[in-house]
């Protein structure tokens, strides 16, 4: 398997890294941005659009760049490296991906073109209270009256739901899960935003006879498309976690070299360097799994199973690296003024977005029905 990047991909990484590095040069700069609404920097979002980043995975005919999952993964990793709060995965990979997969020509042109230009931010309203990352809807229903559709019910939490200009909403219609587009200023739509512990934003979204437009044509069940879109987003979040874990590890290694105890740097204590080495092993195991999963997405293979494997390994590595980064720093690691705690907080949030490690392990274990399934020689 070839995990190397070509010149264009390396150029993309350098450009995105430079932009986000300037926007979030220090942790104080990020704290100022996430302290106010909408929780990310609109100017940085616009600059990403100018670079073509927001249209990367979409077809050129829809206003995009026609790139693939590898390019998307590069952007996600650089976002994680500096904890940039811009909703790239939520808006581009998840909500935008569903519109690209299922939308009519007119819907794709309207939503994806504006998203690529940076003038529209979509969000996927799917999670419901009491559910655990299922691809089906239950609490929101869609009813048709005279050719018009209206939604009733509650979605919570909806990442970036309070800021979104348009919502892609899953709802029950005719006994199956379907998808609808709802404008941010629609009648009967109430959104209550809140700040998450990692500084990102989510919202409670209530529909009270809210006008909606079916996404795409046909009346079939869309839960399969939802599951595939969620899997792609899990892989992208895996790359965001890789960027965050790498920064946490690098920061910890630098601290061990600079901080002195008993007159010598902490890096001279073998027990501490062994712990840092174990962090590196966890990072590289996660990196290999997530990069492999990205190639599965690129080849349109079994995306769901690959995403579960990537999520499990990323979950384990995130917990290990986040915990050790704080432990090896000592008390300063949990202060708001120092960045390591913020990286651990974001890694914890990613671990619970769209399914945590225990959930992924249970799904993988449920797919094992015979010894041959796990026998590499079979």
Over which residues does each language-model region extend?
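Short loop-to-beta-strand entry elements in the cores of soluble alpha/beta enzymes
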Residues: 90-99, 238-240
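Alpha-helical interface subdomain recognition
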Residues: 1-83, 102-105, 118, 148, ...
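Flexible, small-/acidic-enriched active-site or ligand-binding loops
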Residues: 133, 137, 157-158, 183-218
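A structural signal for short hydrophobic beta-strand segments in well-ordered beta-sheet cores
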Residues: 140-142
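Short glycine/proline-enriched turns and hinge-like loops at secondary-structure junctions
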Residues: 67-68, 134-136, 160-164
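A short, Trp-centered hydrophobic/proline-enriched beta-strand micro-motif
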Residues: 118-129
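Short, flexible active-site-proximal loops enriched in glycine and acidic residues
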Residues: 82-91
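A short core secondary-structure module
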Residues: 125, 152-189
């Amino acid at each position: 398997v070839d995990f190397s990047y070509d010149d264009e991909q390396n150029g993309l990484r350098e450009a995105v890294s430079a932009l986000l590095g300037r926007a979030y040069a220090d942790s104080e700069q990020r704290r100022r941005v996430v302290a106010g609404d909408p929780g990310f920097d609109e100017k940085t979002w616009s600059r990403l659009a100018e670079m073509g980043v927001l249209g990367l995975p979409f077809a050129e005919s829809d206003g995009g760049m026609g790139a693939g999952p590898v390019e998307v993964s590069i952007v996600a990793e650089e976002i994680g490296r500096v904890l940039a709060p811009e909703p790239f995965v939520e808006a581009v990979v998840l909500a935008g991906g569903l519109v690209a997969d299922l939308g009519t020509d007119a819907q794709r042109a309207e939503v994806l073109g504006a998203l690529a230009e940076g003038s529209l931010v979509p969000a996927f309203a799917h999670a419901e209270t009491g559910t655990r990352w299922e691809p089906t809807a239950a609490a929101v229903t869609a009813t048709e009256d005279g050719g018009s559709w209206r939604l009733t019910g509650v979605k919570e939490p909806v990442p970036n739901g309070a800021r979104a200009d348009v919502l892609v909403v899953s709802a029950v219609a005719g006994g199956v899960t379907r998808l609808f587009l709802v404008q941010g200023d629609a009648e009967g739509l109430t959104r209550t935003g809140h700040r998450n512990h990692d500084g990102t934003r989510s919202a409670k979204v209530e529909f009270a006879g809210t006008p909606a437009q079916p996404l795409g044509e046909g009346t079939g069940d869309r839960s399969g498309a939802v599951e595939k879109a969620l899997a792609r987003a899990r892989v992208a979040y895996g790359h965001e976690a890789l960027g965050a874990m790498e920064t946490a590890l690098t920061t910890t290694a630098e601290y061990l070299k600079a901080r002195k105890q008993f007159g010598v740097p902490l890096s001279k204590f073998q027990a501490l360097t062994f712990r840092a080495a174990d962090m590196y092993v966890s990072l590289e195991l996660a990196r290999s799994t997530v990069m492999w999963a990205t190639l599965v997405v690129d080849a349109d293979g079994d995306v769901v199973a690959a995403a579960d494997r990537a999520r499990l390994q990323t979950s384990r590595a995130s917990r290990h690296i986040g915990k050790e980064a704080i432990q090896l720093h000592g008390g300063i690691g949990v202060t708001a003024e120092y960045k390591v705690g913020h990286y651990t907080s974001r890694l914890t949030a990613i671990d619970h977005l769209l399914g945590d490690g225990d959930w992924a392990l249970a799904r993988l274990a449920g797919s094992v029905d015979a010894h041959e399934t796990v026998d590499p020689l079979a």
